[in-house]
Amino acid sequence: MLVVQMPFSFPMAHFILFVFTVSTIFHVQQRLAKIQAMWELPVQIPVLASTSKALGPSQLRGMWTINAIGRLGNQMGEYATLYALAKMNGRPAFIPAQMHSTLAPIFRITLPVLHSATASRIPWQNYHLNDWMEEEYRHIPGEYVRFTGYPCSWTFYHHLRQEILQEFTLHDHVREEAQKFLRGLQVNGSQPGTFVGVHVRRGDYVHVMPKVWKGVVADRRYLQQALDWFRARYSSPIFVVTSNGMAWCRENIDTSHGDVVFAGDGIEGSPAKDFALLTQCNHTIMTIGTFGIWAAYLTGGDTIYLANYTLPDSPFLKIFKPEAAFLPEWTGIAADLSPLLKH
């Protein structure tokens, strides 16, 4: 084939150079636009989830958490309050790693865990909570909120009772160990008809209540009244006593009926055994403290609690409302305040 070569004209060279330049500028602009868009994307917060349940970021914006303060009862209250308020306000809830370490070995909790390294990079808005529900808590502003305080009131979460009970379901091995112990108990050689968990809070409260809060802890008389209340209403009850002051309990709880068992180990650093025993009973006798409150809440049944255990001018009543701590259907037995009046 004959190929005729035409001379390359100067105007054609200009045209091709123009097309190449325009194309290059266009692609550079497109690339810069993509890079800028990537810079403007929000930082993705890595979390370690303790469950397979995903909180879709397209559905819930921001991140709410709560300070992990206190021992088991306090942290259960903090967890339940965070769970309820986050749901109420349409925000995703994440728990601190410390709280996960306290609760996860005992319960089947589902809230995802926030790494401490990630938490330290977030511009948190601290939000203090009273120990009772307030109307303003239904409309809390802010996407990155960290609750503070010691909330442990049914007024926050009782409308979600079944969900809270599900969150605080015992792991199988924890529950089975407690049930195995209870199955082996007898009352005067017979199988008990009713199991009543008894939690006696002693420890630091013995000194803190009278010296700081103008209050008292449960005494021998209160416990006798509480046990007799159940003896009058149930056939062959057995009382399963747990305490962080078991020596005091052995000296002050009447065992002449043959229906009292001193159980648990009273070790505050590893409370799973005591707590599981209490919740596997049918009813509860508590004294003071969030440990007993939660045991009663999870157990259901009848609950006897120590009522009016501070003087009317106690500073404790500024941060604690009995009506927000004890369910209305629970039965209170008034404390003996005479030791405080002697001083």
From Swiss-Prot:
Pfam families: Glyco_transf_11. GO terms for biological process: fucosylation; glycolipid metabolic process; oligosaccharide biosynthetic process; protein glycosylation; regulation of cell adhesion; regulation of endothelial cell proliferation. Signal peptide: none annotated. One of its GO terms (cellular component) is Golgi cisterna membrane. The keyword Membrane applies. It catalyses: a beta-D-galactosyl-(1->3)-N-acetyl-beta-D-glucosaminyl derivative + GDP-beta-L-fucose = an alpha-L-Fuc-(1->2)-beta-D-Gal-(1->3)-beta-D-GlcNAc derivative + GDP + H(+); a beta-D-galactosyl-(1->4)-N-acetyl-beta-D-glucosaminyl derivative + GDP-beta-L-fucose = an alpha-L-Fuc-(1->2)-beta-D-Gal-(1->4)-beta-D-GlcNAc derivative + GDP + H(+); a neolactoside nLc4Cer + GDP-beta-L-fucose = a neolactoside IV(2)-alpha-Fuc-nLc4Cer + GDP + H(+); a neolactoside nLc4Cer(d18:1(4E)) + GDP-beta-L-fucose = a neolactoside IV(2)-alpha-Fuc-nLc4Cer(d18:1(4E)) + GDP + H(+). This is Galactoside alpha-(1,2)-fucosyltransferase 2.
